[in-house]
């Protein structure tokens, strides 16, 4: 394989990698927004739950029953984590990190957008 073919292969790989990472961005943004909204709802509900003087006087489950906003948002947040939202919000970073691991064997790397970074060849002495 000559250097021209190698350059074309690298360009094709880079183009496909950047395209793939770029296509993940909208979905990642939506997952991040969902996580932020549910986290803020949970924090707000937790604050209201904690400052309620009735919470200290009743049992734990009764206090949760008295604060359905907190209970539902907390269950939703836990459900999202079980569904893997923590992986979905960082999916492009995971892909880039895995590519960096593989590309390191070939003295290359890539940035978070998928652009290839060619490293100088190590000098063998």
UniProtKB/Swiss-Prot annotation:
Muscle specific with lower expression in other metabolic tissues. The keyword Transmembrane helix applies. GO terms for biological process: lipid metabolic process; positive regulation of triglyceride biosynthetic process; protein localization to nucleus. GO terms for cellular component: cytoplasm; cytosol; Nem1-Spo7 phosphatase complex; nuclear envelope; nuclear membrane. The modification N-acetylmethionine is found at residue 1. It is a multi-pass membrane protein. The chain crosses the membrane at residues 33-53, 65-85. InterPro entries: NEP1-R1. GO terms for molecular function: protein phosphatase regulator activity. Keywords: Acetylation, Cytoplasm, Lipid metabolism, Membrane, Nucleus, Transmembrane, Transmembrane helix. It comes from the Eukaryota. Pfam families: Tmemb_18A. It is found in: Nucleus membrane; Cytoplasm. Forms with the serine/threonine protein phosphatase CTDNEP1 an active complex which dephosphorylates and may activate LPIN1 and LPIN2. LPIN1 and LPIN2 are phosphatidate phosphatases that catalyze the conversion of phosphatidic acid to diacylglycerol and control the metabolism of fatty acids at different levels. May indirectly modulate the lipid composition of nuclear and/or endoplasmic reticulum membranes and be required for proper nuclear membrane morphology and/or dynamics. May also indirectly regulate the production of lipid droplets and triacylglycerol. Interacts with CTDNEP1; the complex dephosphorylates LPIN1 and LPIN2. Belongs to the CNEP1R1 family. This is Nuclear envelope phosphatase-regulatory subunit 1. It comes from Homo sapiens (Human). The gene is CNEP1R1.
